[in-house]
Amino acid sequence: MKLLTTGKVKDVYDDGDTLVFKFSNRISVFDKIIPNEIDNKGESLCRTSAFWFQLIESYGMKSHFIELIDNRTMRVRKFAVPNKVSLGSSNYVIPLEFITRYYVAGSLYDRIKEGKVKPMDIGLKHVPEYGEKLIDPIFEATTKREETDRLLTKKEAMEIGGLTLEDYCEIMEAVFKIDRRIDMEVSKRGLIHADGKKEIALDRERRIVVVDTFGTADEDRFWDEKEYDNGRVVELSKEMVRQYYRSIGYHDKLYYARENGLPEPDIPALSDDMVSKVSDLYRMMFEKITGQKW
């Protein structure tokens, strides 16, 4: 096998007609790789992703998943990853991330606080609090292959992704359909699915294929349902790590540098105690998301 890429989460190998994903214990936030490794993380992401791929295929949706090789390695179908695509392109990974939001959280909350998103833009007459449920879900697209993810308009997403309006709407419908399945599963085990990301390829007939990973404690935001009903948001995903870096002021320093064209500060390491907590979280979340034993 030939190593193709070493990413923030996994190493990708070319194995002839297929690709092999080897999931690492690396962890990143805000497009920065943290100088710690997290035990259990790679296995949690790999096994959780395999669970979802097998589930959506049982409902007739296509994915690139072929098999689990071991608990941290999976084999997937290969698609082209071109630098530029057009409406005539096929058999390629769309260079976008598709994001669905059901609650006010993450970067949406930041944009509201900064005045970049007005309450009326999301169907509200008041400034929402963190964790407030949206009246209607939000579907967004961001860049995938730029140094930092950039939020796009629908027109920009269609141009960058080589998509027609029909393609874009079909992808949106497919992503919401997947999320309904996620909701059905995780609600059985006391979780709220607050938001998530998906990556999509188009096959040779330009049919939708779900690729990369989804529904894990990395890509998606999960909350404890019982705590939420009692008025408290308890983060059960990588958001716990993002909140840690917000609490120590790193997030504000980083984004100030990005917005003003300054050198970006290095991300500090997590404390040993935090590393242990995050490791336990990934192991626990595999069980709560899938209903399977570790």
Swiss-Prot record:
Keywords: ATP-binding, Ligase, Nucleotide-binding, Purine biosynthesis. It is an enzyme of class 6 (ligase). It holds the Pfam family SAICAR_synt. It comes from the Archaea. Pathway: Purine metabolism; IMP biosynthesis via de novo pathway; 5-amino-1-(5-phospho-D-ribosyl)imidazole-4-carboxamide from 5-amino-1-(5-phospho-D-ribosyl)imidazole-4-carboxylate: step 1/2. Coiled coil: none annotated. GO terms for cellular component: cytoplasm. InterPro entries: SAICAR_synt/ADE2_N (IPR028923), SAICAR_synthetase_CS (IPR018236). GO terms for biological process: 'de novo' IMP biosynthetic process. Its EC number is 6.3.2.6. GO terms for molecular function: ATP binding; phosphoribosylaminoimidazolesuccinocarboxamide synthase activity. Belongs to the SAICAR synthetase family. This is Phosphoribosylaminoimidazole-succinocarboxamide synthase. The gene is purC.
